[in-house]
Amino acid sequence: MTKCYQTTLEFSSVKRRRVEADFSGGEITSDAGALLLSQADKRLGLCRDVARALGDQRLRARCEYSVEELIKQRVYGLALGYEDLNDHLQLRHDLAIQTAVSRDKPLSSAATLSRFESRADREAALAIHQVLFDQFIAAHEQAPRRLLLDFDATDTPLHGEQEGRFFHGYYDRYCYLPLYVFCGRHLLVSYLRQSN
């Protein structure tokens, strides 16, 4: 029979909040994977670098959440399978996701995230891609002798009257057809396209 000697697993604390995983009850979440995402993101610095690249033109005195916190909340939510902004009506109160974003209070609302995403433009997309390029370069001690770029398109089904939707005969549905460019395991470009 297997014997377990470790009853808890400790994570980095957030302000006054001690964070540990155990199985004795208390505050329960099905999204504890956000804590692991947060640890990986700390090592990579991806959300931090994207926030710096985007900058913040808002009046800081009127803002409760930093750009980095908004990005982390949205990215971690997407990684956990919560694509819709309305999911954040509940997620903002989840202790694991709050902890992953390094807050000990409720996170931003769906409306705040929506306003944040609505400000995104071509310049923001280029700035984010520059961060991806920089991460790719930083992952190599020296320049690779050869680069093999993998261009992939995949369908993203649409279920409403979204702007720019077209019917794609091959996929037999309305969809977008985003383009992804990888070099090995590194994503270099993610470009949302219409499927026409």
Give names to the regions the model predicted.
Residues 1-196:
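Dynamic "connector" segments at or just before major functional cores
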